[in-house]
């Protein structure tokens, strides 16, 4: 009987142990260190060793392997292999299903692997290797017309591949890798700069004995954290196999032009490869033949995760994985049977901890409804640990579990796995809901008749939405506009609005969106407040020019129209129009299947206003040192800085339904979606009385960048932050994200949404008018002569906010 030692503690190792335990030739399986999944398997056969496979523990692992009569070692992760664990066990006569330290260079050094591919004519992107950062930067600056991928040479904890979008990002990537050594000393010694390729990426796992090989089904991984391949890179959020894009002819090409030359090349170079070869490829369309051509992106020298969970689930019942691994380790792979059940497809969905791939909580209790799992489904554990004292399974990592289902076709496997995911419960769990979407994008077109509705566009839904929102739109009527919708546009009568023909009237336009605040609305299901935001961002930009907003048009784009979501959004737009006194005269609702992931939408708005020539703001020529700066309170974060907001929320791993840290009466989602304040009706009286010199709408850039936009270059705004109490929301974000004070001042409004520039003698009249409207007003500071090379706005008492 075989006694096997498996190294690692992820879902990859759990599925390996599960498959190995099915062999009738296996006695005991030891796992170092293992996880909650292996800890709760049959204790008479599967035993966890609380030993991490670090270099410092190699001797101990060797000693215990000898003591427990281990016949085969199966390393899971790459680091033990790169660090030479194979020779540690070979030295005491124990076979290892894994490459030597020399062969592991295929993964350990990207420079080595690129040179190897070049030497053996294996298709890959063109590249250069640099050992000097200045030379690398010079190369990039000389080729700004080309797109590149920049790779740190070593393992770099899986994070050393950067796809820059500008020359500045490229230069910074070189500095991060080679100068500040952010990915480690070894990884930063040299850098690979290679041509950027576009296309479908696929993964192929190949079992190799140094001479012969067996290709497992091709898989496709999903690296990004969010649906639609958005957000940060992860270790992998799901996979499926076989990938339909890998046609039989393409598989033959991959085997003959990539896999076999790799195995033969390694052997001929004196480092025969044993173990599993992971080949990551991209399929690039040949401009001459219009055929997909595979090119190698990377090699790994171990099983991939989560591809392994899907691929090994497709082995047929006659395949004894323990004997396969042993045969490969002993260079006799052709002596054993390996079979794939080619009648089935497999899909794996990773369930992660909230906040992953950044900070996340550990120690949350996991409940698995295993009795409710659909057939042909398994849960493989990764970031888990078993607490024997309480007989509980707890979270202990970012990627917590992998749920894998197989079925007779891919669509059924997808449907099954998402039913199975409902059987997994722990606090703040998260998973992608679009695993395998590329397979259906690439599937052959159906021969049945296709209607416009079949394409994903519902004319009926559009008409129903118009009927739903008509009353909301009518509620925004004002003199000059009837605010009816359904036609080809909207009319506005300036005379009815009070602007006479003999007056010098100018029209003013503004267009804006809501930004990434929309993502939070979509994740929380709160859609009405961002409609107010959309109006506010536009009409506030009109009023700072002295203009009265007259009418508004909105644009709402989505992949699949949800009438309730769109109606909620338009209700917010109508609310904002009522608050600002402008008419909602029309808009566009655009349903574009495939453009946006499920549940996502984008929006934009345009406002048009009018102003008499003599009332145009700012009155720069009338401003002078000594003029007063007044501030009006904001309602919160408004609509700027939400990329930072989301980054901090991910960092602290708070769910949107958690109690709001700065307002316990609300959830976090409700608190952060507080709509932008509209400042129109309260400011128009002072504008018409010509009491104001200028206005600054405090948006992205904060006080320090927005006030200078409203004053002449020779003047400087001095703002004293001790004149108002900064709201708790900004202090909380500053503390939670440890945000530098300069950064937070250039990102958020800090409690002041609008700044007024007023002559000293007009301050009382302006304040009286605003007080009648219920406004909170602060005297923030004043204008002074601007010293040479000094900034346009100086903040005082802004360094002890939190």
Swiss-Prot record:
One of its GO terms (cellular component) is cytoplasm. Pathway: Purine metabolism; IMP biosynthesis via de novo pathway; 5-amino-1-(5-phospho-D-ribosyl)imidazole from N(2)-formyl-N(1)-(5-phospho-D-ribosyl)glycinamide: step 2/2; Purine metabolism; IMP biosynthesis via de novo pathway; N(1)-(5-phospho-D-ribosyl)glycinamide from 5-phospho-alpha-D-ribose 1-diphosphate: step 2/2. ATP binds at residues 141-203. Mg(2+) binds at residues 298, 300. Residues 451-802 are annotated as: AIRS. Its main location: cytoplasm. The modification Phosphoserine is found at residues 455, 458. One of its GO terms (molecular function) is phosphoribosylformylglycinamidine cyclo-ligase activity. It is found in: Cytoplasm. GO terms for biological process: 'de novo' IMP biosynthetic process; adenine biosynthetic process; purine nucleobase metabolic process; purine nucleotide biosynthetic process. Keywords: ATP-binding, Cytoplasm, Ligase, Magnesium, Manganese, Metal-binding, Multifunctional enzyme, Nucleotide-binding, Phosphoprotein, Purine biosynthesis. Its EC number is 6.3.4.13, 6.3.3.1. Binds two magnesium or manganese ions per subunit. Its cofactor is Mg(2+); Mn(2+). PROSITE patterns: ATP_GRASP, GARS. InterPro entries: ATP-grasp, ATP_grasp_subdomain_1, PreATP-grasp_dom_sf, PRibGlycinamid_synth_ATP-grasp, PRibGlycinamide_synth, PRibGlycinamide_synth_C-dom, PRibGlycinamide_synth_C_sf, PRibGlycinamide_synth_CS. It holds the Pfam family AIRS. The keyword Magnesium applies. Residues 1-450 are annotated as: GARS. It catalyses: 5-phospho-beta-D-ribosylamine + glycine + ATP = N(1)-(5-phospho-beta-D-ribosyl)glycinamide + ADP + phosphate + H(+); 2-formamido-N(1)-(5-O-phospho-beta-D-ribosyl)acetamidine + ATP = 5-amino-1-(5-phospho-beta-D-ribosyl)imidazole + ADP + phosphate + H(+). Catalyzes the second and fifth step in the 'de novo' purine biosynthesis pathway; contains phosphoribosylamine--glycine ligase (GARS) and phosphoribosylformylglycinamidine cyclo-ligase (AIRS) activities. PANTHER family: TRIFUNCTIONAL PURINE BIOSYNTHETIC PROTEIN ADENOSINE-3 (PTHR10520:SF12), TRIFUNCTIONAL PURINE BIOSYNTHETIC PROTEIN ADENOSINE-3-RELATED (PTHR10520). In the N-terminal section; belongs to the GARS family. In the C-terminal section; belongs to the AIR synthase family. Present with 35800 molecules/cell in log phase SD medium. This is Bifunctional purine biosynthetic protein ADE5,7. The lineage of its organism: Eukaryota, Fungi, Dikarya, Ascomycota, Saccharomycotina. The gene is ADE57.
């Amino acid at each position: 009987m075989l006694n096997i030692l498996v190294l690692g503690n992820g879902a990859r190792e759990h599925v390996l142990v599960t498959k190995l335990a099915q062999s009738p030739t296996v006695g005991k399986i030891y796992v170092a260190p293992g996880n909650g999944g292996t800890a709760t398997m049959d204790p008479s056969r599967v035993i966890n060793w609380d030993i991490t496979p670090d270099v410092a523990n190699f001797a101990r692992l060797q000693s215990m392997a000898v003591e427990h009569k281990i016949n085969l070692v199966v390393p899971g992760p790459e680091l033990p292999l790169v660090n030479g664990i194979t020779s540690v066990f070979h030295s005491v006569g124990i076979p290892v299903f894994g490459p030597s330290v020399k062969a592991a260079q295929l993964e350990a050094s990207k420079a080595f692997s690129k040179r190897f591919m070049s030497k053996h004519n294996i298709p890959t992107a063109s590249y250069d290797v640099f050992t000097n950062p200045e030379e690398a930067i010079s190369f990039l600056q000389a080729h700004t017309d080309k797109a590149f991928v920049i790779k740190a040479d070593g393992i770099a904890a899986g994070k050393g591949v950067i796809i820059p979008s500008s020359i500045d990002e490229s230069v910074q990537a070189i500095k991060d890798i080679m100068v500040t050594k952010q990915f480690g000393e070894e990884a930063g010694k040299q850098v690979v700069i290679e041509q950027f390729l576009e296309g479908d990426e696929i993964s192929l796992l190949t079992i190799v004995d140094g001479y012969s090989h067996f290709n497992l089904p091709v898989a496709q991984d999903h690296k990004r954290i969010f649906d639609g391949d958005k957000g940060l890179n992860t270790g992998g959020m799901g996979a499926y196999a076989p990938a339909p894009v890998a046609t039989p002819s393409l598989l033959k090409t991959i085997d003959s032009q990539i896999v076999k030359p790799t195995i033969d090349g390694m052997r001929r170079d004196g480092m025969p490869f044993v173990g599993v070869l992971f080949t990551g490829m991209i399929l690039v369309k040949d401009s001459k033949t219009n055929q997909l051509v595979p090119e190698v992106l990377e090699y790994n020298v171990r099983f991939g995760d989560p591809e392994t969970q899907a691929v090994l689930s497709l082995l047929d019942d006659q395949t004894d994985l323990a004997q396969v691994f042993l045969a490969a380790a002993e260079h006799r792979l052709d002596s054993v049977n390996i079979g794939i059940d080619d009648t089935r497809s497999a899909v794996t969905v990773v369930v992660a901890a909230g906040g992953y791939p950044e900070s996340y909580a550990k120690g949350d209790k996991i409940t698995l409804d295993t009795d409710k799992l659909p057939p042909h489904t398994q849960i493989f554990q990764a970031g888990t640990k078993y607490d024997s004292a309480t007989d509980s399974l707890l979270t202990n990592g970012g990627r917590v579990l992998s749920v894998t289902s197989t079925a007779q076709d891919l669509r059924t496997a997808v449907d099954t796995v998402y039913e199975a995911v409902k059987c997994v419960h722990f606090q703040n769990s998260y998973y992608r809901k679009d695993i395998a979407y590329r397979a259906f994008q690439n599937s052959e077109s159906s021969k049945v008749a296709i209607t416009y509705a079949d394409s994903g566009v519902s004319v009926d839904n559009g008409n129903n939405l118009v009927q739903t929102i008509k009353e909301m739109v009518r509620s925004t009527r004002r003199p000059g506009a009837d605010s009816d919708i359904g036609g080809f546009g909207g009319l506005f009568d300036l005379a009815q609005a009070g602007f006479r023909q003999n007056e010098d009237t100018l029209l003013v336009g503004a267009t804006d969106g809501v930004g990434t605040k929309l993502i939070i609305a979509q994740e929380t299901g709160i859609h009405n407040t961002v409609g107010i935001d959309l109006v506010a961002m536009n009409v506030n930009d009109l009023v700072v020019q002295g203009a009265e907003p007259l009418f508004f048009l909105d644009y709402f784009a989505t992949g699949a129209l949800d009438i309730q979501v769109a109606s909620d959004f338009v209700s917010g737009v109508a609310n904002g129009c009522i608050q600002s006194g402008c008419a909602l005269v029309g808009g566009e609702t655009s349903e574009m299947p495939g453009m946006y992931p499920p549940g996502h939408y984008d929006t934009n708005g345009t406002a048009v206003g009018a102003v008499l020539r003599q009332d145009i703001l700012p009155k720069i020529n009338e401003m002078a040192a000594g003029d007063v700066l007044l501030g009006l309170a904001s309602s919160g974060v408004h609509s700027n800085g939400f990329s930072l907001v989301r980054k901090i929320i991910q960092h602290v791993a708070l769910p949107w339904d958690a109690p709001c840290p700065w307002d316990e009466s609300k959830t976090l989602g409700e608190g952060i979606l507080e709509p932008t304040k509209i400042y129109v009706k309260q400011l128009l009286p002072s504008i018409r009385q010509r009491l104001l010199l200028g206005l600054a709408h405090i948006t992205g850039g904060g006080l320090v960048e927005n006030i200078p936009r409203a004053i002449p270059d020779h003047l400087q705004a001095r703002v004293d932050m001790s004149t108002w109490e900064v709201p708790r929301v900004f202090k909380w974000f500053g503390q939670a994200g440890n945000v530098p004070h300069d950064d937070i001042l250039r990102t958020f409004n800090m409690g002041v949404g609008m700044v007024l520039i007023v002559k000293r003698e007009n301050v009382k009249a302006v304040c009286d008018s605003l007080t009648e409207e219920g406004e909170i007003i602060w005297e923030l500071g004043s204008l002074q002569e601007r010293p040479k090379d000094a900034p346009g706005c100086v903040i005082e008492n802004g360094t002890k906010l939190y």
